[in-house]
From Swiss-Prot:
One of its GO terms (biological process) is tricarboxylic acid cycle. Pathway: Carbohydrate metabolism; tricarboxylic acid cycle; oxaloacetate from (S)-malate (quinone route): step 1/1. Keywords: FAD, Flavoprotein, Oxidoreductase, Tricarboxylic acid cycle. Its EC number is 1.1.5.4. Its cofactor is FAD. PANTHER family: L-2-HYDROXYGLUTARATE DEHYDROGENASE, MITOCHONDRIAL. It comes from the Bacteria. The keyword Transmembrane helix does not apply. GO terms for molecular function: 2-hydroxyglutarate dehydrogenase activity; L-malate dehydrogenase (quinone) activity. Belongs to the MQO family. This is Probable malate:quinone oxidoreductase. It holds the Pfam family Mqo. It catalyses: (S)-malate + a quinone = a quinol + oxaloacetate.
Length: 494
């Protein structure tokens, strides 16, 4: 059986469905097909239980503001990520006004973001605050070492803590908790109501090859075992960990030399309703010296299907699957002659990561509780249950010196003719989804992106695209106020 489509999106998560929504707004006549191998959209990395749900805006995440050798704080990444997440919020607000998405409360809730440190890390947090507060993006940040104020914001931090321990927090009221899976499902539901948009669940893309200007995809219906050949002019691989094997099968030169390293996650989930109700914040700490960025601990209020929850983690683990429901053969089968040496080099250069993962795998319940007790000293083991989170594939690619290097961000790979794009990597991931998709559009729909029709539409969809909010305070206030009002988030004008 053969099916034709102008655009094929592989994977039914937040990435693919956001690209679909943007393309249908820019070119409503475009025929788009989404192929998802599982029973529903957004069941892997986008699922509410498989990620932290943090709207990453660098309001509290200390790994985005490293301390340099001279003691100063590098805030360049924080400024960038803050504006990237704003693009996502602007597009969601636009979609609510256009009734593409339902009310903001169905997928996004205001939750304050706090950074928290103790003892000898306190000077770092104060210096971070002093560096960030002059930017309009962080002007409303509050720093305090006052225990009474901290107790008001986050009472669990003080329960059972010694009175002499030095501690400090920064507080940002404008943080958020996001259900990325719900956004993907709402996009899928709304877009499917119109002709020219098809979602195929239980459909696995097994292979893809290029013939002339057309991609031929080998697809199997995993329920009926019917095989199909699907033709497409443009293919986006947005299947989380499943994107990497398909990128390899595509054969595009731009994908050669890349490797993927799978890392699993685990949460401690609070089962005590009294404790859950006491806490209302996402609180991020600082990774221990030598630990990778993925190890940053955080104590998170989540709003999951309308119910308040409390999670702590993440604790990392290792298995060879690229997806939570994937195969143990995923990692070994991804090793090729063109990526073997870069992967070995990355392994040699990341011995601390290997040691960290071994420690995490061997961790006992008691050891996990000790990590939680840094945030909540009065925590008791019976109040918490361990639950596996999602699976991520960290990117390995050659650095500027040609040596394999482990990456902790998100990577967009496109073919030279712009007919295929693949998304690899992890954090900040879904929070910056709109910025990532704008990059895909720029690389793969370059001619259309230059037209006045697309430029005008993009200005309506994401008003701050290609504009620095820091350099135009009036525009900053107008854009952020309008977005905050639609999303029911707090906002104070600068």
């Amino acid at each position: 059986m053969s099916e034709d489509s102008e655009v094929v999106l592989v994977g039914g998560g937040i990435m693919s469905l956001t690209l679909a929504a943007m393309l249908r707004e820019l070119k409503p006549s475009l025929h788009i097909s989404v192929y998802e191998m599982f029973e529903d959209l957004a069941t892997e990395s986008s699922s509410v239980w498989n990620n932290a749900g943090t709207g990453h805006q660098a309001l509290c995440e200390l790994n985005y503001t490293p301390q340099k050798e001279d003691g100063s704080i590098d805030v360049s990444k924080a400024l960038k990520i803050n504006q990237q997440f704003e693009l996502s919020k602007e597009f969601w607000a636009y979609c609510i006004r256009k009734q593409i998405l339902k009310g903001a409360h169905t997928f996004l809730n205001p939750v304050p973001h706090l950074s928290f440190v103790v003892d000898d890390i306190v000077p770092y947090l104060k210096k971070r605050y002093e560096t960030l507060k002059d930017s309009p993006l962080f002007k409303n940040m509050i720093y305090t070492e006052d225990r009474e104020q901290i107790k008001e914001w986050a009472p669990l931090l003080l329960e059972g803590r010694g009175e002499t321990q030095k501690m400090a927090v920064t507080y940002m009221a404008g943080g958020s908790d996001v259900d990325f899976g719900e956004i993907a499902r709402q996009f899928g539901e709304k877009l499917s109501q119109k002709e020219g948009f098809d979602v195929y669940t239980h459909h696995k893309v097994r292979d893809l090859t290029k013939e002339g200007n057309i991609w031929l995809l080998d697809v199997i219906d995993t329920k009926s075992y019917e095989r199909k050949q699907v033709k497409a002019k443009f293919v986006f691989l947005g299947a989380g960990g499943g994107s990497f094997p398909l990128l390899q099968k595509s054969g595009i030169p731009e994908g050669r030399g890349y490797g993927g390293f799978p890392v699993g996650g685990l949460w401690l989930i609070c089962n005590n309703r009294e404790i859950i109700e006491k806490h209302n914040a996402k609180i991020y700490g600082k990774a221990s010296i030598g630990d990778p960025p993925m190890s940053v601990p955080h104590l998170d209020t989540r709003i999951i299907r309308g119910k308040k929850e409390l999670l702590f983690g993440p604790y990392a683990g290792f298995n060879t699957k690229f997806l939570k429901k994937g195969s143990f053969f995923d990692f070994p089968s991804s090793i090729r002659l063109n990526n073997f040496i870069p992967m070995i080099q990355a392994g040699i250069d990341n011995v601390p990561l290997t040691i960290y993962l071994i420690k995490q795998i061997l961790s006992t319940d008691r050891m996990r509780m000790r990590k939680l007790e840094v945030f909540f000293p009065a925590a008791q083991f019976p109040d918490w249950n361990a639950q596996f989170a999602g699976q991520r594939v960290q990117v390995i690619k050659k650095d500027k010196n040609g040596r394999g290097s482990l990456q902790f961000g998100t990577e967009v790979i496109t073919s030279s003719d712009g007919s295929l794009a693949a998304l690899l990597g992890a954090s900040p991931g879904a929070s910056t989804v709109v910025d990532i998709m704008l990059e895909v559009l720029k690389r793969c729909f370059g001619d259309e992106m230059k037209t006045s029709a697309w430029q005008d539409k993009l200005a309506e969809m994401v008003p701050s695209y290609n504009r620095s909010l820091e350099e135009n305070i009036t525009h900053f206030n107008e854009c952020r106020l309008k977005t905050a009002q639609t999303l029911h988030l707090p906002f104070d004008e600068i």
